[in-house]
Amino acid sequence: DWLNNLYRRAHADELNPAVESFVGQFTMAEITELLQGKGIPCVPVNTPMGFAKDEHVQQRGFMAAVEHAGFGKTKQPAMPFVIDGERIPVKTMPLLDSWRAPSYVSPESGEKRDRESSELTLAATSGPAPSSGNGPLDGMRIVSFDHVLAGPYGTTILAELGADVIKIESSKGGMDPFRFFGTGEDPNVSPRFLEFNRNKRSFTVNLKHPKGQPVLHDLIAKADAVLDNYSVDVVERIGLGYDQLCKVKPDIVNLRMPGLGTTGPKRYFSTVGVNITAFTGLTYLWNHPGVTNPPIGSQTVFPDYVSGVLCAIIIISGVLYRDRQRKGAFIDLAQSEATAFMIGPSLMEAAASGIDPQPIGNASPAAVPHDCYPCKGDDRWCVIAAENERQWTALANILGSAIAQDARFKTMSDRLEHRAELNAIISRWTKSQDAFDVMSRLQQAGVPAGVVQTGEDLTNDPQLKARGFIVEVNNPRLGRVVLPNFPLQFANSKLTRRWEFPVLGKDTEAVLRNVVGYSDETIKQLRSDGVLE
C-alpha cells in the first residue's frame, strides 16, 4: 500500500513522523548524500549565506564579484542563466545620474536626442515582423520536451503569444505526469494539464524505436528553438544534446532548465520545486521571526513559475539573437538560480555584512502596519499596509480617534517600535468584520488592503471577470472548465487561442505532413512500425 502515492497522501499523519525519526539520525549533509545517491530529491534547507557559499553555486559563478562606490568589494547575484558557457557581465547599481547618456544633435532634424536611447530604438525596430495577426510570436516554432510545470508554463506563455509549440511525448513511457493529475488512468482529462498545455500541439514518438530519433531530427530541423526541463543527463542519453542538435540545425536555439543547471558538482541532483526553494534560502526566509523549527515555507512551487517566465523571455531573446547574428545558442537556465534571483537583496545583504538576514514574517522595515489580519468567518483574512503618513492618517481615522491621537503611533518610527501593539488593535477591529467589507472600506479611503482570496473567490472576482481573465469554456472531454486567461492584452495584435484539450498524439500526423513534409505513405508506414506512439 505504501508504494501507492494516493495511499501515502491519505496516511501522511502516520508517514511523516516515521520520516522525521529516520532523517533525524543524520546531519543535513549526510541525509542529502544518502538520498540523492538513491535518486530521491533531497537538499539542505539553506540560509541565504549557506546558498551563496555552496560549492555548486560558487563553481557556477552565480554570485559575481563586483566593486561598488558605496559598498566597496562585494558580491551580488548574476543573471540566472549561462549562454554558450558565459554569463552576462554584472554591472553594479548605478549612482544617481551616473549613467546619463550623452546627447547629440541630429544632423537630419536638428533635434537634441539621447544617443543610447536612439541606438536602442534602431535595434528594437529591426528584424522580421510577424507573418500574420495571430500574435506577436506567430511564425516561431518551438519543439518542447517539457513536463510537469516549469517547462510547460514557459512554453504556454510562448504559445499564448502565437508561437507554434509542439510538445513531444510518448505513450511508451514518456507522458507528462500532469496528464494524470487527479484523474486516474485517462491521460486526456486532467484540467491541470490543460491549464499548462493549452494552445500547444501534441506529438508522440517512440524514442526506443530505431526510427524515432531520425523522425525527431527531421522535425527539429524545422524549428527555431528546442527546450527541455528534464534531469541533466536525459537528453544526452536520447541523442538530443546540443552538439547533436547543431548537426541537425546549426543555428538552433537550445534552452535547458534542470533544477541546478547543466554544470557544477551537484548538476545531477534530483529536485522538485520544494527542494529548489529550500536550497536557495527562500524557504528559510519564508517564516515568522524567531521560528526556525521547521521553516514554514510554501507549497506553491515558485521555482517552476519564475523559471517558466524566464524560459519564455530567454527563448524569445535567443531567437532574436539568432536572427541578427545568424547563429544559434545554448542556454543553461538553472531553476535554482532563477529562484535565488528573487531574493537578490537578501543574498547581497549576506555577502556585504557577513550576517544572514532573518525571517520577518509579513512585516516590512518601511511600512507599519504591514500584515495579514483575521476577519469574520473561517480562515478569512485581509492584508493591510500603510507606507506613508497619508495612508496612516486615513487608516487611523477609520480605527477611531483614540488611535489617531495615540502617541505610540505618531510617526513611522513610533509605529515601527510599537508594531505588535498596533497589530493587536487592528486585529481586534478586523475580527468582527467581513474581509471584503474591510478591503472595500479601506480602499475607498486610499489605504492599501486586499482580501486573501481562495480559488473560489478568484473565479468570482468581479475585477478579473471584467477584464476577461476568468474564462469559462465547454470542453468536449471535461465539460465546463474555468481557466485563467493570458494576463497580457495587445492593442494591435490578436491572440488566437485553442481551448480544446491537447489529446495525446492528436497532432502527430498533421505536423509530419505539414511541417516536416512527409508523405501520407511515409506517415502510414511509421504508424504501422510503432514509431509514432
State the predicted function of each range.
Residues 1-38, 369-445, 449:
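Aromatic-enriched alpha-helical interface/lid elements that frame and gate functional surfaces
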Residues 3-6, 295-306, 328, 360-361, ...:
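A short glycine-threonine-serine/GTX helix/turn-capping micro-motif
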Residues 6, 29, 66, 98-324, ...:
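N-terminal helix-loop segment corresponding to the beta1-alpha1 unit
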Residues 73-96, 186-218, 276-285, 371, ...:
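Redox-cofactor-proximal catalytic regions of oxidoreductases
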Residues 301-316, 335-343, 387, 391:
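Mid-domain beta-loop-alpha active-site segment that forms a flexible
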Residues 308-329, 341, 345-353, 396-403:
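Oxidoreductase and adenylate-handling cofactor-binding alpha/beta cores
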